[in-house]
C-alpha cells in the first residue's frame, strides 16, 4: 500500500536535531576563562622582557670584555707613562731658573682654573682668554655714531713681523709727540709694565736690557752735549772780553791840564 500523502509530508518536514552548544559546568565561572587569557598575555610579556634583559646583559658583557685590558697592556701603558715623566724631568733640567718659575706659574694657574671648573660646573672659564676685547673710542661730543672700534681694525691685529712694525710706526709718533708734557715721564713706566706683564720673565729681562742700553746711549749723548755746550760758552765769553777793549786813540794832552806847579805845593 503506497504511503499516504500525509506520511510523505511528515517525513519531509522532520529537520535534523540541533547541535547542542557547550554548556558551562556547574563549577565553572566566567572569571576563570578571563583569567586564563590574562595569564597567557602576561606570560608573553614576561618572555619579551626576559629576552630583552638577556640581550642587554650579553651586550654589556661583550663591551666589558672589549674594554678589559690584559696584564701586558697595563704594564705597557705604565711603562709609557713613566718614560713620559722621565722625559719631562730631563727637559726641566735643561731650562734655567727663570723659565722654571714661569712654567711653575703656568702650571699653578692651569691647576687653579681646572679646580674652578670643577667647582662651578661646565662654565667655560677660558672662552675669553686670548680674545681681543672691544675697544671703542668716542669723540669729544660723545656721539655714539662717531665711535670707532679700534679692535676691529686690521692694524691692531698684527701677526707677522711686518705687521708689528707697521703698528709701531703708527703708534710711536702719536705717543712720542706727547713726550714734552710733564705727565709723560710719569705715565710711561706704568704703560710699559702693562704692555709686558703677560710676557715670561725671560722676555721681560730682554725688554729691560734694551731699555738699559737705551739709557746708557742717552747718557753718552747728554754728556757729549754738555761738553759741547761748555766749550761754546767759554769761547763766547773770551770773544766778549776781547771785544770790550776800546780801540779809540787817546788824544788828550795831559801836560796842559790847567794846573800850575804851585797847585801841588
UniProtKB/Swiss-Prot annotation:
InterPro entries with a match to the protein in the record: eIF3-like_dom_sf (IPR023194), eIF3j (IPR013906)
Recorded coiled-coil stretches: 43-95
GO cellular component, one term: eukaryotic translation initiation factor 3 complex
Keyword Protein biosynthesis: yes
GO BP term (any one): formation of cytoplasmic translation initiation complex
Job description of the protein: Component of the eukaryotic translation initiation factor 3 (eIF-3) complex, which is involved in protein synthesis of a specialized repertoire of mRNAs and, together with other initiation factors, stimulates binding of mRNA and methionyl-tRNAi to the 40S ribosome. The eIF-3 complex specifically targets and initiates translation of a subset of mRNAs involved in cell proliferation.
Family according to the record: Belongs to the eIF-3 subunit J family.
Assembly mode: Component of the eukaryotic translation initiation factor 3 (eIF-3) complex.
Protein name: Eukaryotic translation initiation factor 3 subunit J
Amino acid at each position: 500500500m503506497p504511503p499516504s500523502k500525509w506520511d510523505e509530508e511528515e517525513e519531509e518536514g522532520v529537520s535534523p536535531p540541533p547541535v547542542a552548544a557547550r554548556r558551562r559546568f556547574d563549577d565553572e565561572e566566567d572569571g576563570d576563562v578571563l583569567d586564563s587569557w590574562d595569564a597567557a598575555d602576561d606570560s608573553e610579556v614576561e618572555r619579551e622582557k626576559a629576552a630583552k634583559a638577556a640581550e642587554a646583559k650579553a651586550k654589556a658583557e661583550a663591551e666589558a670584555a672589549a674594554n678589559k685590558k690584559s696584564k701586558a697592556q697595563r704594564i705597557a701603558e705604565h711603562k709609557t707613562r713613566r718614560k713620559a715623566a722621565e722625559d719631562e724631568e730631563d727637559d726641566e733640567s735643561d731650562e734655567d731658573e727663570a723659565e722654571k718659575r714661569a712654567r711653575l706659574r703656568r702650571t699653578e694657574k692651569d691647576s687653579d682654573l681646572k679646580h674652578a671648573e670643577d667647582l662651578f660646573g661646565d662654565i667655560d672659564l677660558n672662552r675669553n682668554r686670548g680674545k681681543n676685547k672691544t675697544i671703542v673710542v668716542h669723540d669729544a661730543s660723545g656721539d655714539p655714531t662717531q665711535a670707532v672700534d679700534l679692535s676691529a681694525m686690521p692694524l691692531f691685529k698684527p701677526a707677522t713681523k711686518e705687521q708689528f712694525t707697521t703698528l709701531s710706526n703708527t703708534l710711536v709718533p702719536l705717543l712720542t709727540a706727547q713726550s714734552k708734557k710733564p705727565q709723560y715721564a710719569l705715565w710711561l713706566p706704568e704703560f710699559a709694565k702693562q704692555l709686558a706683564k703677560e710676557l715670561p720673565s725671560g722676555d721681560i729681562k730682554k725688554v729691560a736690557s734694551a731699555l738699559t742700553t737705551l739709557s746708557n746711549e742717552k747718557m753718552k749723548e747728554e754728556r757729549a752735549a754738555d761738553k759741547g755746550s761748555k766749550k761754546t760758552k767759554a769761547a763766547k765769553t773770551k770773544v766778549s772780553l776781547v771785544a770790550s777793549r776800546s780801540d779809540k786813540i787817546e788824544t788828550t794832552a795831559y801836560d796842559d791840564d790847567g794846573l800850575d806847579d804851585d797847585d801841588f805845593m
